[in-house]
């Protein structure tokens, strides 16, 4: 018990109690605005780039010093005499981005301290940032497992949950009060997630702050897995120690486990959920917990997670958000792929002197397939096809040139081929590419008030192929003599290490 308490105790040198005064410093906003340092999505917003001048920041800080005028308010009636009424669109992203940068400081320093304190070198793992790095992991491990928990992580339904989650790591009460005031006044209600309009508006205008709060919320949730994994494994992971450096964490976990099994011995309770062969994967709100254990063991974990969310986050976690599935007869939908484990039969002939034997072996293999029905639905939502998958023409601006139209369709097609290059069967990918190519042809024919056949006959089919050429086709044209060798590469799965976000069509969103 004492060893665990020392392991989970927050170091004195990592307690930062003076974050609030940084809000009044001009250089903080300069750091937050710098693209190379922050890499914030707000820096990509062209409407905000022209408004973040040093003069505006100075005026903002001057008004913030005037206590009578420092009122953050988001009313529908803009006639009220408030600090935010006239300059809502101007000051809101500046303060939110600066505040998000400030509260990230303890986390960044904590990570550096954790690595340097253990004589570790900070290694840039660029390849592990790729989404495709997850699938080789699935291929290596999931074929030996039995059950999987398919978990949909609930969103925080109250702003106080986000503030309390951040309070576990940040001890500056003034900054937390400002954050609470900022969230409550912006949403104009007690709920952040329940009103969809308020949540959507907040996440779009304050992307950096929203992502930081949501990631802190998920980090709090995932810390229990790191804790149990550390306690149940002899090869303890030290690189994730920063996730456990929080206030009162041990007491909360002990209380949750005691509630779960209603026994006072914490170590005895911990053995009930120990499993050395357990794997955890998460992307956004979707998480997977796979184990080699039995169905009873997975039901214990399901009950444990429900109790953890209800007592630790004070919110209802519906048991139907967690599905227990057997890996061998269930297709797992994750990151736009359908992954399942199938038996790959093979016949081996063995001959001993005059006798020969035929041995049938069945090897488990992880297949990654393309979900064609959701992709066709996404293409129909983006106006590339109808609900049956028949290509249709898109309405485009009259001032767009043919080259720009073809370039847009070609970029979408190449990105889709790039993302689904790891599919075991690419027939579905060919169908989606066919929909995009014919939709592009019909869009151009509609623009020129002609038919598709007449348009292609006039320009030639090579005109489209030049821009819609996939990466595999480039290999064949570049190395024609090695076509037989490249054909095997073309049919095999290829995982790329430069994909940092899920494809729009794969994510079933119409952002195109």
Swiss-Prot record:
Pfam families: Intron_maturas2, MatK_N. One of its GO terms (biological process) is RNA splicing. The keyword Nucleotide-binding does not apply. Keywords: Chloroplast, mRNA processing, Plastid, RNA-binding, tRNA processing. GO terms for cellular component: chloroplast. InterPro entries: Domain_X (IPR024937), Maturase_MatK (IPR002866), Maturase_MatK_N (IPR024942). It is found in: Plastid, Chloroplast. One of its GO terms (molecular function) is RNA binding. Its main location: plastid. HAMAP family: MatK (MF_01390). Usually encoded in the trnK tRNA gene intron. Probably assists in splicing its own and other chloroplast group II introns. Belongs to the intron maturase 2 family. MatK subfamily. This is Maturase K. The gene is matK.
């Amino acid at each position: 018990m004492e060893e665990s308490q020392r392991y989970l105790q927050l170091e004195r040198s990592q307690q930062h109690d003076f974050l609030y005064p940084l809000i009044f410093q001009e250089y903080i906003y300069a750091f937050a605005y710098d693209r190379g340092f922050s890499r914030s999505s707000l820096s990509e917003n062209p409407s905000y780039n022209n408004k973040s001048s040093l003069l505006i920041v100075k005026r903002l800080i001057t008004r913030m010093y005037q206590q009578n005028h420092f009122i953050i308010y988001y009313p529908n009636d803009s006639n009220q005499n408030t600090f935010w009424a006239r300059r809502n669109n101007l000051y809101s992203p500046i303060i939110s981005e600066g505040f998000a940068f400030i509260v990230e400081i303890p986390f960044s320093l904590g990570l550096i301290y954790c690595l340097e304190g253990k004589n570790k070198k900070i290694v840039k793992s660029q390849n592990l940032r790729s989404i495709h790095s997850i699938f080789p992991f699935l291929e290596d491990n999931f074929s030996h497992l039995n059950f999987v928990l398919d978990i949909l992580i609930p969103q925080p339904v109250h702003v106080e949950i986000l503030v309390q989650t951040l309070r576990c790591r940040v001890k500056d009460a003034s900054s937390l009060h400002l954050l609470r005031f900022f969230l409550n006044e912006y949403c104009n209600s007690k709920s952040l997630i329940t009103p969809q309009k308020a949540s959507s508006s907040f996440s779009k205008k304050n992307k950096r702050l929203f992502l930081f709060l949501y990631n802190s919320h998920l980090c709090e949730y995932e810390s229990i897995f790191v804790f149990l994994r550390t306690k149940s494994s002899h090869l303890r992971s030290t690189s994730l120690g920063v996730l456990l450096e929080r206030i009162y964490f041990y007491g909360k976990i002990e209380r949750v486990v005691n509630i779960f099994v209603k026994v006072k011995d914490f170590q005895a309770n911990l053995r009930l959920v120990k499993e050395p062969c357990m794997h955890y994967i998460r992307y956004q709100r979707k998480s997977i917990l796979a184990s080699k254990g039995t169905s009873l063991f997975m039901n214990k974990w399901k009950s444990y997670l429900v109790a953890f969310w209800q007592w630790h986050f004070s919110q209802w976690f519906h048991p139907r958000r967690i599905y227990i599935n057997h890996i061998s007869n269930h297709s797992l939908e994750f990151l736009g792929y359908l992954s399942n484990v199938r038996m790959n039969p093979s016949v081996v002939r063995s001959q001993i002197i005059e006798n020969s034997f035929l041995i049938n072996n069945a090897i488990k293999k992880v297949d990654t397939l393309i979900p064609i029905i959701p992709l066709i639905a996404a293409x129909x939502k983006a106006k590339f096809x109808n609900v049956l998958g028949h290509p249709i023409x898109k309405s485009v601006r009259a001032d767009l040139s043919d080259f720009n139209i073809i370039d847009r369709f070609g970029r979408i097609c190449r990105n889709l081929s790039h993302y689904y290059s790891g599919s075991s069967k690419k027939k579905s990918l060919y169908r989606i590419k066919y929909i995009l190519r014919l939709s592009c042809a019909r869009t151009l024919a509609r623009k020129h008030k002609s038919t598709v056949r007449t348009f292609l006959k006039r320009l030639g089919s090579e005109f489209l192929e030049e821009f819609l050429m996939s990466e595999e086709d480039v290999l064949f044209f570049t190395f024609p003599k090695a076509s037989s060798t490249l054909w095997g590469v073309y049919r095999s799965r290829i995982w790329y290490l430069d994909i940092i976000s899920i494809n729009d069509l794969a994510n079933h969103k119409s952002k195109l």
